[in-house]
């Protein structure tokens, strides 16, 4: 069985560490990303000390970058493992969904982004907010900043 978190799209990788890989996800929320453990395990509680340390470093970097670039107010982090159990051949893989949240509107490449659900739970079905050109600009801006720190 193929695991989508073991076979990541190389063109969307923001950062690949020794233990975790950060990829840009669909841009329904500006800067939305997925942080995926590089090894295949099914429980977050099974990560080791080195993985936990790198996780903390990546968390700090990503929060700092989104704050610097776009004035991000906060990040929602969630580890939803339940979808793996909806398949016959269950094979969960530890990964976290990162949804940045913005109190103020943000302009990127002359496109305005407003977090319409700020202060409430996110919309799982929110539409993508940016065109492909702007998504590439977002990706490059974040990746460049990530590699400078």
Where are these regions (language model features)?
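HIT superfamily nucleotide-processing domains
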Residues: 1-149
